[in-house]
A protein has these predicted regions:
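C-terminal helical "tail/cap" subdomain of flavin- and related membrane-associated enzymes
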Residues: 298-376
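Conserved N-terminal helical subregion
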Residues: 20, 48-170, 375
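Glycine-rich FAD pyrophosphate-binding loop
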Residues: 20-41
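Conserved N-terminal glycine-rich FAD pyrophosphate-binding loop of Rossmann-like flavoproteins
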Residues: 34-54
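Conserved FAD-binding catalytic core of PHBH/FMO-like flavoproteins
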Residues: 133-241, 247-250
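Beta1/beta-strand and adjacent pyrophosphate-binding region of the FAD-binding site
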Residues: 1-11
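Conserved mid-domain beta->alpha element of the FAD-binding
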Residues: 10-17, 138-139, 251-330, 334
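Conserved Rossmann-like nucleotide-cofactor binding loop
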Residues: 11, 36, 144
């Protein structure tokens, strides 16, 4: 079988490595514009239980190969904070890895297995020819996939552009922080959200997110991420943290969530963010990419008929991702209104509000009933 993959992100690379491991006679070619995936937005991933299981099925020694020169902290707890409250909760065990580390490991693994990586940017008009030249074409080219756009009607694509802006940073201080951190700090402009994962004991990959209105107000108005750092450091250090953000030289991005009604058209299939992309609060992360890649590879290993394999892949993934997609959309809509949610809630309840999101109305009702003696 001859397979071409457009894009060398986690989904396409994992698929190529896994399938080539079990079908070394398959001819797999990845088309990737030089450094495009490596330089794409985002600076890291958190690998949790399912991710490590899937990596181990491809490479029993993946951890040693991934971290050959250093040790990364194991994450077992999540720290939630607002301006004046905090709570530590259990976290599904995992560890963080930089984007560069993960992609370099997967690229090296792919080439060692005989996968061809070609330095070429595929244009939309070239996709039909690829479909003629190969038995199967995978669009693994990320959230702005050219195949997704070219076949949007056939694939029944949908996207939701949230009224939220985010960007990536690193935080490096003397303070040790090995938890996954989720902060929501209220300010004059609105609520600033911080999500971070430890790369070392003293360094974290950080996402800062806020509503469009928040970014367009007060001290943040008109400021690029680098210019906003002094204000963000001051605000986010008010509850016991040492925040000293380092810019990733990336702009503010508008968050976009992708979904599809169908994952393939003829002999072309979508994989990874090209098909589904979720807000981080849905708890999916790189798991979606690995799960889709593994599922498609399994379908091809069990079905010599490509059409049947793609039909099974489509059914399995849409079944698997229906609920995460609903959760992601629900949370995105909640975050779009987070400034208002905090404004109408007493500060003593901000942490519970943040933790329970759209269920908080029931939380308040329950507490009110208990306070009046109705609750038993």
């Amino acid at each position: 079988m001859r397979i071409s993959i457009v894009g060398a992100g986690p989904a396409g690379l994992y698929f190529a490595c896994y399938l080539k491991t079990f079908k070394p006679d398959f001819e797999i070619t990845i088309f990737e514009a030089k450094h495009e995936s490596m330089n794409d937005f985002g600076i890291g991933y958190t690998l949790q239980k399912l991710d490590t299981i899937l990596l181990e099925r491809m490479d029993a020694n993946f951890y040693q190969h991934l971290f050959c020169n250093e040790v990364t902290p194991t994450i077992t707890q999540a720290l939630f904070k607002t301006n004046n409250q905090e709570r530590t909760l259990p976290f599904s065990e995992g560890f963080s890895v930089t984007r560069e580390q993960l992609l370099e490991y997967l690229m090296n693994k792919a080439t060692s297995l005989g996968v061809t990586i070609t330095n070429k940017k595929v244009l939309p008009k070239e996709l039909p020819q690829l479909q003629n030249d190969f038995d199967l074409v995978l669009a693994a080219d990320g959230i702005s996939s050219i195949a997704r756009e070219l076949y949007k009607d056939e694939l029944e694509t949908k996207e939701h552009k949230a009224k939220l802006k985010f960007s990536w940073f690193t935080n490096k201080t003397e303070q040790e922080r090995t938890e996954a951190c989720f902060y929501a700090f209220n300010s004059a402009e609105g609520v600033i959200l911080l999500t971070s994962y430890p790369l070392t004991k003293n360094k974290q990959a950080v996402v800062i997110e806020m509503t469009d209105n928040c970014l367009d107000s007060g001290e943040l108005k008109g400021k690029e991420p680098t210019q906003a750092i002094p204000y963000l450091n001051k605000l986010l250090s008010e509850n016991g943290d040492e925040i000293s953000l380092i810019p990733a030289n990336l702009p503010w991005y508008t968050f976009k969530m992708n979904t599809v009604g169908k994952l393939y058209h003829d002999n072309l299939a979508l994989i990874g963010d090209a098909a589904y992309s979720f807000h981080y609060s849905a708890g999916q992360g790189v798991t979606t990419s690995f799960s889709m890649a593994y599922t498609l590879a399994q379908c091809l290993l069990k079905n010599s008929n490509i059409n049947l394999a793609l039909a099974h892949y489509n059914h399995s993934i849409n079944l698997l991702l229906t609920e995460p997609a609903k959760k992601s959309l629900r949370h995105m809509e909640w975050f779009e209104n987070i400034d208002q949610h905090f404004r109408i809630t007493d500060s003593q309840h901000w942490l519970d509000l943040f933790l329970q999101k759209d269920e908080f109305g029931q939380f308040k009702k329950t507490n009110k009933e208990c306070n009046t003696g109705v609750c038993r």
